[in-house]
Amino acid sequence: MTGRAAQAAARRTAVALGLLVVLAGCSVNLPGTSTQGSGAVRTETRSVSGFSAIQLAGNGDVQIEQSGTESLTISAEENLLPLLTSDVVNNELRLGVKDGARIDTTQPITYKVTVRELTGMDVAGNGSQTATKVKTGSLRIRMAGTGSITATGTADAQDIQMAGSGTYRGSGLTSKTATVKSAGTGNAELAVSDSLDVNIIGNGTVTYTGSPQVNQSIIGSGSLQKK
């Protein structure tokens, strides 16, 4: 090996070792430890009120029904229940995990929510929300990550914003107008009668039914398809 080649090899080795040190440091400095689920599932009812939107951060499945009441039940492993949060902030029920806590589930986390009028659904992470019997003036959809949202019923207007590779299944929710902004590889399905505005950056797909007036802007390999 020539002197120049040896120096290059030494530099590569030094860089590799440096990366290992950085990675090792990152792994040592991760805050907290993960709490393993016990496997024993318990259902807990919590008192909630004054909300019309639901946000889920992390994993779990939220089942929402629009009715004349406001309620929340959580089914999860009993040792994880104290770590699950359910706070109402600015008219939004926020479901997640306590700050600094990390959980490792062996059984699904299921939230059942009833709400008087549903105006917003928000998923951050790989969780899911499903809403039935929706009847509202405007429904706001926010997605970040790989999660999914499904909605059925009626809404005068929909405002949908997606980032990541999530899926919005709104073909069972009829609406007059809809606005969709998608960045990433997400997929959205919806039913619109009057007007549809679509802005796609990336290779996401928006599929719609109905005969609305369509305005579209697509940057990348994304697509807008009429079903």
Name each region found by the language model.
Residues 2-81, 92-114, 223-227:
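Short acidic/polar N-terminal linker immediately downstream of export determinants
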Residues 44-45, 52-64, 103, 110-113, ...:
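Extended, compositionally simple hydrophobic/Ser/Thr-rich segments
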Residues 89:
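ATP/nucleoside-binding phosphotransfer catalytic cores, i.e., glycine-rich phosphate-binding loops
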